[in-house]
Amino acid sequence: MGKIMEGFIWETAKELDLKLAQRVRNIRKRRSISQEKMASMSGVSYGSVKRFESTGQISLLSLTKIAMALDIADELRNIFSQVPYRDIKEVINETR
């Protein structure tokens, strides 16, 4: 379970990885793609696809290949693209 801090629930890295894997698995299943077919489409081994979906563990390169095969690479391209500033110091540091 995540940690509660100042009214926010913070997930562990493992929990976040598993949620990401679940989302990718749901997209794969929604498109009626088997794990074997996903492996073939993406060039990622069947074992890696299976491990990712059950544990959340995968290399960034393999995740990118899977995203490209599922035509959701834009989701990766946009990750961290609109991270809000935490304070004015970050704004100042970015303009230097």
Map each language-model feature to its residues.
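A detector for short, charged/polar N-terminal pre-domain segments
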Residues: 1-19
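Short basic helix-loop element that most often maps to the first helix and adjoining turn
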Residues: 22-38, 96
